[in-house]
Amino acid sequence: GVYMEIGRCRXEAXRRRKEAV
């Protein structure tokens, strides 16, 4: 659960979430 979310953020979510903030 947490591991999958972190891997996804490193991919694209992360990038998208950082730009939105």
Swiss-Prot record:
GO terms for molecular function: adenylate cyclase activity; ATP binding. Its EC number is 4.6.1.1. It catalyses: ATP = 3',5'-cyclic AMP + diphosphate. Keywords: ATP-binding, Lyase, Nucleotide-binding. It is an enzyme of class 4 (lyase). It comes from the Eukaryota. This is Putative sperm adenylate cyclase. The lineage of its organism: Eukaryota, Metazoa, Chordata, Craniata, Vertebrata.
